Amino acid sequence: MMFRNFDDSGPPGHEPRFEPGTLVWHRRYNYRAVVVALDSSCQAPSNWYASNTTQPDQDQPWYHLLVHGSAQTTYAAEQNLEEDLSGQAVEHPLVKYFFKSFKGGKYDRNDELWPSW
C-alpha cells in the first residue's frame, strides 16, 4: 500500500477508509477520482489550507486524487469522500504513470512515488 505520510500511532478510528487505487466520489464538488496516495493528516502548507474555503478538519486522512475527465489533481479530506461503486475507469493522463492495471473497479498501484509538497 502506498502511504506517502501515514502514521498509524494516532487514536483508534483514524485508519483510512480508502487505499490507493480506490475509486471515490467527492460529495461537495461532485467529481469522480482515483486515490493515488494518502496522508494520515493534512500535510499541505498552512497558506494552502488557509486558502481552502471549506477548511475540513486537518486531523483525518487526506487523499491525493486524480480527477476523472481532466488533468487535474486534488487533495481532499476523507470526510468529503465516499466510495464510487460505478466500477468505471477514471480517465486521467497520469493513470498509466501511477497504476499497473484496472480490474474489478479498482486500480493496482505501482511503486511510483507521489511528489511531496
PLM features: what roles do these ranges have?
Residues Q58-W117:
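Intrinsically disordered, low-complexity, charged/polar segments
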Residues V35-V36, A77:
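Short, solvent-exposed loop/turn and secondary-structure capping segments
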Residues M1-L23, Y29-R32, D39-C42, N110-W117:
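Mixed-charge, Lys/Arg-rich low-complexity intrinsically disordered regions
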Residues L38-D39, Q88:
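Alpha-helical interaction segments
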Residues R27, V36, H68:
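Structured beta-strand/turn binding interfaces of compact recognition modules in eukaryotic regulators
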Residues T54:
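Phosphate-recognition beta-domain surfaces
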